[in-house]
């Protein structure tokens, strides 16, 4: 029995975040032996916070499991919460989806995308908005909902981006971006447009993909994170792909981009890789940096 957090995340060095899948912004510094951590995306917290967020379990459940790990209590399998059943998983997805409305210019979701320089006149059907959704951390917040589709084009789960009350930024919480529980097939993504032929781009995050689409004037889909991006496959009939990687200090985003590019190129596809010039930037950063230059021109 173990909590399940990978050991390479717990070495007091910058590396992958077990919560948000960032590749080099997490560090477990274990101050005063309390398991403290900090992540550029998720924020900071203590060891119990990390364990609860990683497992989705409550404080008493985690405390009980740690007691068992330390030998303070005998491990009884029936004391551990069983994994969510498929019926429960689908019910949870339907319940969240039922609360959503079309993402339009009158919603706080639009205000959020405008704040990121990527407001649209009309948003893709894969993006919707929930005015008030439970965030899994004791709060209720506005939320942008994204449908994640599998490599066969079938919907597999939902991705949630929780927003501030005014919609002008992500919510001030440890994990404002969350996938719904359950397995996600390799190659899944958020299709931010219908594929009608021609070149197609792929990026990590939703905002990153929308920004790359603005800058390069082509459709770009979102793979959610670097790990999912390198496993992505383009839709049938697509033989030209532009890969938009993040410029990570430890090269995680670049590595994922080039691994994907290599795999697709070996299959005979025409592939280009694009990385922002500035270290630490993704394509939304690049877009926001370019906007003042465009306005001054």
PLM-predicted stretches and their roles:
Residues 119-139:
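Short, basic/aromatic recognition patches
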Residues 1-75, 120, 237-239, 265, ...:
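N-terminal structured subdomain of primase-like DNA metabolism proteins
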Residues 135-236:
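Phosphate-handling DNA/RNA-contact segment within nucleic-acid enzymes
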Residues 105-122:
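Compact soluble domain cores
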Residues 60-62, 69, 109, 228-231, ...:
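Short gly/pro/ser/thr-enriched loop/turn and capping motifs at secondary-structure boundaries
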Residues 38-45, 197-201, 206-297:
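TOPRIM fold recognition
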Residues 49, 111, 210:
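Alpha-helical elements of the RecA-like P-loop NTPase motor core of helicases
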């Amino acid at each position: 029995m173990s909590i399940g957090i990978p050991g390479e995340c717990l070495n007091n060095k910058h590396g992958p975040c077990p919560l948000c899948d960032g590749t080099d912004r997490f560090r477990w510094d274990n101050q005063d032996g309390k398991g403290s951590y900090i992540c550029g995306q998720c924020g900071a917290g203590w060891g119990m916070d990390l364990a609860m967020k990683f497992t989705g379990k409550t404080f008493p459940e985690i405390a009980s499991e740690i007691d068992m790990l330390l030998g303070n209590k005998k491990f009884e399998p029936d004391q551990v919460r069983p994994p969510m059943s498929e019926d429960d998983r689908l019910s949870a997805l339907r319940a969240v989806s039922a609360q959503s409305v079309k993402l339009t210019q009158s919603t706080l979701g639009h205000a959020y995308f405008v704040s990121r320089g990527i407001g649209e006149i009309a948003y893709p059907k894969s993006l919707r908005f929930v005015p008030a959704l439970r965030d899994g951390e004791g709060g209720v917040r506005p939320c942008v909902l994204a449908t994640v589709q599998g490599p066969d084009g079938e919907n597999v789960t939902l991705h949630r981006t929780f927003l501030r009350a005014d919609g002008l930024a992500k919510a001030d919480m440890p994990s404002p971006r969350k996938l719904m529980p359950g397995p996600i097939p390799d190659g899944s993504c958020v299709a931010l447009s219908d594929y009608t032929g021609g070149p197609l781009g792929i990026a990590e995050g939703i905002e990153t993909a929308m920004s790359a689409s603005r800058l390069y004037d082509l459709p770009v889909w979102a793979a959610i994170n670097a790990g999912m991006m390198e496993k992505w496959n383009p839709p049938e009939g697509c033989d030209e792909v532009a890969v938009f990687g993040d410029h990570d200090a430890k090269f995680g985003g670049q590595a994922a981009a080039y691994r994907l590019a290599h795999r697709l190129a070996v299959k005979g596809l025409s592939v280009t890789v694009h990385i922002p010039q500035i270290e630490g930037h993704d394509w939304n950063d690049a877009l926001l940096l370019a906007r003042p230059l465009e306005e001054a021109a």
